């Protein structure tokens, strides 16, 4: 399977860390409601969320699912720097659809990854969560725009400065199917006013609205509420 994040991996943490810093307190608070059983982090990326998960649940096993080989490089580097956390984290190099999960889950985390799943794959995921999630335990996801196929003009995603160089990312999207857009994300490196490099990645993204998500969850016996930008899912 092609690795759509290969061109983004070296910049990934620089661009996305501010987002994780922003949602960290809310994620920590929700995860304190976890039940018995391992915590599954779907689409863990480079593991930016793992320290928050680990602090919220210091005794839980964590299963980190990440299919991208290039992002797993950053993930294992992070775990190497957190040896105590690494003792509790098992990394599965698969997608959510293929991952073998334990029969009881204490919590599920899936930040900025739902767009990688088709409606059929989402339905399968919700059914698996409904069958495995401990009573009262949360599954925490996020919804990203657009919520339906639409053109999105290029806009900045973020930037960071390391030494003399400035790293930035911007993206645009175009409809590419009944429930899909294709994102085109460009990463640039500048030294002052001089652009040193530019790399663009494209990936398809399945759109889903809040209403669609509520319907899907209801059919699986689940329900959702919003909390500080997070979608918190529980058993009905």
Question: What are the residue ranges of the model-derived segments?
Answer:
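Conserved class I S-adenosyl-L-methionine
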Residues: 1-45
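Class I SAM-dependent methyltransferase SAM/SAH-binding core
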Residues: 47-98
